[in-house]
Amino acid sequence: MNLESDKRQSAQSELDFSPRGEARKVGRQEVESLPAMGEPESPANTCRIMEEVCERDNLREALQRVKSNKGSAGVDGMTIDDLSAYLKEHWPVIREQLLSGTYEPKPVRRVEIPKPDGGGVRKLGIPTVLDRFVQQAVMQVLQRQWDPTFSQHSYGFRPGRSAHQAVAQAQQYIVAGYGWVVDLDLEKFFDRVNHDKLMGQIANRVEDKRLLKLIRAFLNAGVMENGLVSPSVEGTPQGGPLSPLLSNLVLDELDRELERRGHRFVRYADDSNIYVRSERAGQRVMESITHFITHKLKLKVNESKSAVARPQERKFLGFSFTAGPEVKRVIAPKALERFKQRIREITRKVKGVSIKTTMEELASYMRGWRGYFGFCETPEVLIALTRWVRLRLRAALWRQWKTPRRRRAELIARGVTERLASNTAGSGRGPWHLARSKALSVGLSNAYFRSLGLPSLFGTC
């Protein structure tokens, strides 16, 4: 190793991991005082990937990503806020462990969250903050190398690709006459990935034995649940930055098989839809691909959730499609029900918190929901949902006001005539019925809710 290379390695081991934007501001003088880096030392081949993982720019990007993703602590209790200070003190040792192949990840912390469709729970494995940082640094390097080689039909967890693009591609297949879908559901995919099979796929792309050992260590790190650590014999736990990339690598073999057979398909992570022209063709594809997945990939197809059907009868990434000559994207019924259920949960809180707090929570949820489901082509549904949210709020505020005296006073204060306010306040009708009344439409108008920050799901409806 020459003198210049020695200087670069010394600089790498002394990286300044001070938190950006915190007590210390990085100004011109401070930047100039950082160790001179020179040009990045790029590995000549896949035998030296760990050197690229430990490059300064890659590490800074990894730190920024881990911080922006936030997330809870792992088994060691270290939080995101603690990470920069920890790295500042311990980075030289950590770097040496990574480059010598002796870094040992800690077990992941088991967390269970309800599935959106109410069908049980999804098990997550939360790595420690430090392990997330290392995984992120590894993932960035491998993603740059692997992603260009992945199938054009794969859309999940890939830079520059999205669920919206996947749904639009599915729509194009339907418009082109492929009116039947083979909807494949992989049973507990992330929990059942075969480690030996996966490591073989990685070894076909990576020669750096240190990296192979590190990835194997992450896979075998174990799971801590209720204070006890269980060994990990299969699966890539959801919750770590590396898991989505590894899942794409596993299923790239499925993509290539479908391409080899000439199928029209779309895959987003473990959601795969294959589009064919007839039900009979779909049944043949289902049988043969299930055999391939079971015997070649060592995975299991969930037969109860998989089906050959019309696209209008299935959902894909929260959307479905209309029948008829003009195929439109629509929001799947379960997604609509989940939206309403969440709105009910938020508006029930009006009784115990201020309307401002409720509005902030509603606005945050509705903007996020609109950002994704606004991709539908049925604006009338979005308009109806916005009106429904306002009705929920009117009913909730009516309950909050409780007594006829207060209800009358609140309505008058909001511009309702005394006579109409008195008649409405004395009504024996329930809150949901009165939410549609003229008095509440005037006193709690659309403009009033807009002034409180309530967004619309479509335009200014």
Regions found by a protein language model. Name each.
Residues 1-461:
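Non-catalytic terminal/accessory segments
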